[in-house]
Amino acid sequence: MSKKDALSRFLFEKSAVRGELVTVTETYQSILENHHYPEPVQHLLGDLLVATSLLTATLKFDGDITVQLQGDGPVRLVVINGNNEQQMRGVARFSDDVKAGSSLKEMMGNGFMVITITPKKGERYQGIVALDGETIEACIDNYFNQSEQLPTRVFIRTGLQDGKAAGAGMLLQALPASAEHSADETAEHFELLTQLTHTIKAQELFTLDTKEILHRLYHEEDVTLYDPQPIAFHCTCSRKRCEDTLVTLSKEDVAHLLQEQGKIDMECEYCGAHYIFTEEDINNINKLSSSNLH
């Protein structure tokens, strides 16, 4: 039986290091549903989902985070959207040239990872890092190194569990030096914990209870585990958003679409939901829009 998707935070009591563990298997499967992604693209989406969930958990405010991969290779775009409530969705755009076993470089070509953090209150932040690493894990580590934040490492595991897509991961982050823990002590312990965490296997993360995982990795450490936070697939599409988009189109374009198909069928690329608009629907939307302007 698969584990429920959740984020678990933990703290090493005798050192200035914190951690996160996420399981995103059900969310990952929901993102893949209704799409026909080649296997390498599926893995890419899974890795980025795990990474985004871990990044989202580092936010200390209400807001959204978007992690995008953009490149000039067969895979042009991969996007995961998340928020502080761990509601996630994602999509990829690709050509037919994605070959089995393709590496990140072979799929994305020359590209960038763009991380956009949008608080509900306050200014938006955007960080950009070149896709120089061989894996998403390496690219995220590069992002933290370049942004001069606290020492941080991520550990991403995706694959199959019972024949279905599965994903999970961990994050370690050193906390600022204090009277109790010097910077040198923290750096030394952080390196030790990093080496221990590297040994975690995908199947262990996919199947074992969080307490069991922490015990296996850090049985000589004093670890405090906090209550888990659910993670779930959640799409923000709606009929209202589609209506708002239709209002921005010219009347000629809308009339042309109606003449061609007799209706306008708008499909969400994230979840596959369809929103159908007839000529009568369009007229009502235009009337409403016109009345709101006066």
UniProtKB/Swiss-Prot annotation:
Cellular compartments per GO CC = cytoplasm
Q: Which Pfam families match?
A: HSP33
Q: What does its PTM field state? A: Under oxidizing conditions two disulfide bonds are formed involving the reactive cysteines. Under reducing conditions zinc is bound to the reactive cysteines and the protein is inactive.
Q: Does the keyword Signal apply?
A: no
* Superkingdom to which the source organism belongs: Bacteria
Entry keyword Isomerase: no
Keyword field = Chaperone, Cytoplasm, Disulfide bond, Redox-active center, Zinc
Task: List the InterPro entries hit by this protein, alphabetically.
Answer: Heat_shock_Hsp33, Heat_shock_Hsp33_C, Heat_shock_Hsp33_N, Hsp33_helix_hairpin_bin_dom_sf
* Single GO MF descriptor: unfolded protein binding
| Signal sequence, renumbered to the chain | none
A Gene Ontology biological process in which this protein takes part is:
protein refolding
Question: Listed disulfide bonds for this chain?
Answer: C235-C237, C268-C271
Q: What is its main location?
A: cytoplasm
Q: Which family does it belong to?
A: Belongs to the HSP33 family.
Q: What does this protein do?
A: Redox regulated molecular chaperone. Protects both thermally unfolding and oxidatively damaged proteins from irreversible aggregation. Plays an important role in the bacterial defense system toward oxidative stress.
The name this protein carries in UniProt is 33 kDa chaperonin
Name of the gene: hslO
